[in-house]
Amino acid sequence: MNSKIRKILAGLFFVGITLLFLDFTGSIHAWLGWMASFQFLPAVLALNFGVVLLLVSLTLFMGRIYCSVICPLGVLQDIFGWFGKKAKKNRYTYSKPMNMLRYVMLGLLVVALVAGFTSLAALIAPYSAFGRIASNLLAPVYLWGNNLLAAWAESVDSYAFYSVDVWMKGGITLVVAIVTVVLLFVLAFKNGRTYCNTVCPVGTVLGFLSRYSHLKPVIEIGRAHV
């Protein structure tokens, strides 16, 4: 896929899914709710075979396009990685694949789902991880911004916005969200989507399928630029 097209699609999915987590009116869900149904693990758990088949087919044809376009956590890491590239002259360094860790995390997710340990499964699942980040860290800022607009609208006799209560979640959920975003930033800043390639169970499954993809990246040494 063309890099510019991929970035545009990734931006649309990232903004759309983020707004789904921040929306408190329900209006955005009416227009963009379909984006949530295209998340791989939720589709598997919901037995949405049509979506699963589509995502698998895309992977077999174009590689891990899901991780770089549709998954919000993958796109978030690309954003962090962009800052990393700007901050340092050197490109990403090669890291040996940690297959054992990947398969352990995948097995842990499967066991957690089968045993009914939903909290553990949610801790590992990428879509759930992004949801915690959006709900715990971004939602309060979004609501405060809404309330500022509501106050301004009221001052000019407009009711386009209305104030809502803002509350921050505390306890373990907030701590997990903070630790997750910090860890993702550090890993992506240094070496790109490390989480996707070593920890994420969805990345492990799609990475295996992408070995047989029709389109694969090819490095032409004669065209390399310094």
Each PLM stretch: what is its role?
Residues 1-223:
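Non-ligating segments of multi-cofactor redox enzymes
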